[in-house]
From Swiss-Prot:
GO biological process terms, semicolon-separated: translation
Region (Disordered) residue spans: 1-41
UniProt xrefs under PROSITE patterns: RIBOSOMAL_L35
Gene: rpmI
Keywords in alphabetical order: Ribonucleoprotein, Ribosomal protein
Keyword Transport: no
Top-rank taxon: Bacteria
UniProt entry tagged with the keyword Ribonucleoprotein: yes
InterPro entries, A to Z: Ribosomal_bL35, Ribosomal_bL35-like, Ribosomal_bL35_CS, Ribosomal_bL35_sf
Pfam families, sorted: Ribosomal_L35p
GO CC term, one of those recorded: cytosolic large ribosomal subunit
The protein, known as: Large ribosomal subunit protein bL35
PANTHER family: 54S RIBOSOMAL PROTEIN BL35M (PTHR33343), LARGE RIBOSOMAL SUBUNIT PROTEIN BL35M (PTHR33343:SF1)
Length: 67
């Protein structure tokens, strides 16, 4: 069986935290900011943690990723 490879798209989008959780960035942050409130834009800047339902699948894509 061939080696598993790290999914490069996922490797660019997710980072592991010190406790082993996965950090991600929010969607809706690339354009069309005029109709978004300042509060919404401020909240979108912060990182989010991957939900437990998605964790197993994403963690499998990042098999060998250290950080």
């Amino acid at each position: 069986m061939p080696k598993m490879k790290t999914h490069r798209g996922a490797a660019k989008r997710f980072k592991k935290t010190g406790t082993g959780k996965l950090k991600r960035s929010h969607a809706y942050t690339s354009h069309m900011f005029r109709h978004k409130s300042q509060k919404q834009k401020r909240k979108l800047r912060k990182a989010a943690i991957v939900h437990s339902g998605d964790f197993k699948r994403i963690h499998q894509m990042l098999t060998y990723k250290k950080k």
